[in-house]
Amino acid sequence: MPAVTYEHIKTCKQSGARLGIVHTPHGSFETPMFMPVGTKATVKTMSPEELRQIEAKIILGNTYHLWLQPGNDIIKHAGGLHKFMNWDGPILTDSGGFQVFSLSNLRKITEEGVEFRHHTNGSKLFLSPEKSMQIQNDLGSDIMMAFDECPPMPAEYDYVKKSIERTTRWAKRCLDAHQRPEDQALFGIIQGGEYEDLREQSAKDLVELDFPGYAIGGLSVGEPKPVMYKMVEHTEQFMPKDKPRYLMGVGSPDALIECSIRGMDMFDCVLPTRIARNGTCMTSQGRLVIKNAKFADDLRPLDENCDCYTCQNYSRAYIRHLIKAEETFGIRLTTIHNLHFLLKLMEDIRQAIREDRLLDFKEEFFEQYGLNVENPKNF
């Protein structure tokens, strides 16, 4: 039996949304689920205890960054990533591929792997399917990702076609190199840019390899959202119904709802934590930029409909002061709020699927979120 399995509970009668449970060696979580990103073995400014309090069930670690610092050997010596960072829930690690393709301009792709420069000190590095598997086996995550090529968007058809074929060959090498299939599940990543036939080919080729789960990669990289939704809708039909489906890099409220409707189960994104650091907050009325002068004496919470620690205890005026003064506590408060907001949104999505009313929920949510006149429909 694979290390990770998917249990289907029901499909929403209004949409293609799925309610399910993903079972892992470190516990189970209901889907659709958002996964906070802990790039360097920490979700920035948050303790594992705080993550549990806001109902985070699974978090993401970054293979590329952890390989470079502190090094996978140190994490292995500590007993794996769970012990190293004191998180006993499920962890997903990416393959390092996205960082190699996005952070480094000086890269050379060969059949063997990718040669590139360290994003800070310029030293030469090499990452291959085998190396990515070795690092992720050392990290000991519950879900590992296959090492894939991430073509830019847009890219020429012929280039993307060659790229997905290489991604499939690399996926086979990942399966061969994976040392711990009994306690770590390896997911394949479907690529194909904005070309429907290539997405289909990539999905079918990878499904033949029988991974325990599948991701859609190469979206949410700056393309218009309708293009992303179209690609998800098209690709979903070629993904197994009995395995988890992970849409990589998606974390805006509208996209989480739209892509849950289109049958996706798992999502991750740095968006809620990244925007929190400059004082941008997600609220039920839309985005709120706390640095704005009008909040200087506003004693209301960030969101009057929110029961997170931040909203129960602190005012907009206080949080604005902290962010303006560059106090770390301000970033902690906005991060707690944004992550709580998205995890609560996922809970609401799951409840709407249970009640067969996800399209109704979408309409209600969008209408309220768009009430922010200053920032209409900006998710």
UniProtKB/Swiss-Prot annotation:
Gene Ontology MF term list: metal ion binding; tRNA-guanosine(34) queuine transglycosylase activity
Cofactor note: Binds 1 zinc ion per subunit.
Coiled-coil boundaries: none
Protein residues bound to substrate: 94-98, 148, 191, 218
Keyword Glycosyltransferase: yes
Keywords: Glycosyltransferase, Metal-binding, Queuosine biosynthesis, Transferase, tRNA processing, Zinc
Renumbered residue ranges of the record's region RNA binding: 249-255, 273-277
Enzyme Commission identifier(s): 2.4.2.29
UniProt binding sites for Zn(2+): 306, 308, 311, 337
UniProt xrefs under InterPro entries: ArchSynthase1/Queuine_TRR, TGT, TGT-like_sf, tRNA_ribo_trans-like
One Pfam family in the UniProt entry: TGT
CC per GO annotation: cytoplasm; cytosol
Metabolic or biological pathway, per its Swiss-Prot or TrEMBL entry: tRNA modification; tRNA-queuosine biosynthesis
Reactions accelerated catalytically: 7-aminomethyl-7-carbaguanine + guanosine(34) in tRNA = 7-aminomethyl-7-carbaguanosine(34) in tRNA + guanine
EC class of the enzyme, as a word: transferase
Cofactor(s) listed: Zn(2+)
BP-aspect Gene Ontology terms: queuosine biosynthetic process; tRNA wobble guanine modification; tRNA-guanine transglycosylation
Active site: 94 (proton acceptor), 268 (nucleophile)
Xref: NCBIfam families: Q_tRNA_tgt (TIGR00430), tgt_general (TIGR00449)
Protein function: Catalyzes the base-exchange of a guanine (G) residue with the queuine precursor 7-aminomethyl-7-deazaguanine (PreQ1) at position 34 (anticodon wobble position) in tRNAs with GU(N) anticodons (tRNA-Asp, -Asn, -His and -Tyr). Catalysis occurs through a double-displacement mechanism. The nucleophile active site attacks the C1' of nucleotide 34 to detach the guanine base from the RNA, forming a covalent enzyme-RNA intermediate. The proton acceptor active site deprotonates the incoming PreQ1, allowing a nucleophilic attack on the C1' of the ribose to form the product.
Subunit structure: Homodimer. Within each dimer, one monomer is responsible for RNA recognition and catalysis, while the other monomer binds to the replacement base PreQ1.
Annotated family: Belongs to the queuine tRNA-ribosyltransferase family.
Protein name per its UniProtKB record: Queuine tRNA-ribosyltransferase
Source organism (scientific name): Staphylococcus aureus (strain NCTC 8325 / PS 47)
